[in-house]
Amino acid sequence: MVKNSFISIISQEENKENRGSVEFQIVSFTNKIDRLTSHLQLHKKDYLSERGLLKILGKRHRLLAYLSKKTRVDYKEFKELIDQLDKTKTRVDYKEFKELIDQLEKKTR
């Protein structure tokens, strides 16, 4: 009984975040990139993981370009934002990223 209630609480918390949004996908790709980068530092000849990393980098690049068109914010500002997030933390938080994007949108209006 307790286990089922715990699972339902977890599923309700997961539904609060919009997992299909572009911002959430960018954050999750950034976290995956961080994990793969640390993995590749240990396993230098893991070429399959390196290829996966390059694919994820390309996907994130395309999503950032789409997001900059959608929000009418310069792509370079988004790239600087991602670089700042990559340098400051090992894990990027969705809510912080969303707030920073909203701040950039307000600047351009």
Curated annotation (Swiss-Prot):
InterPro entries: EF_hand_dom, Ribosomal_uS15, Ribosomal_uS15_bac-type, uS15_NS1_RNA-bd_sf
GO CC annotations on file: chloroplast; ribonucleoprotein complex; ribosome
Subcellular location: Plastid, Chloroplast
Gene3D superfamilies registered for this protein in UniProt: S15/NS1, RNA-binding (1.10.287.10)
GO terms assigned for molecular function: calcium ion binding; structural constituent of ribosome
Biological-process GO terms, alphabetical: translation
Domain of life: Eukaryota
Keywords on record: Chloroplast, Plastid, Ribonucleoprotein, Ribosomal protein
One Pfam family recorded for the sequence: Ribosomal_S15
Family: Belongs to the universal ribosomal protein uS15 family.
Complexes and interactors: Part of the 30S ribosomal subunit.
UniProt protein name: Small ribosomal subunit protein uS15c
Species for this entry: Trachelium caeruleum (Blue throatwort)
Gene this chain is encoded by: rps15-A
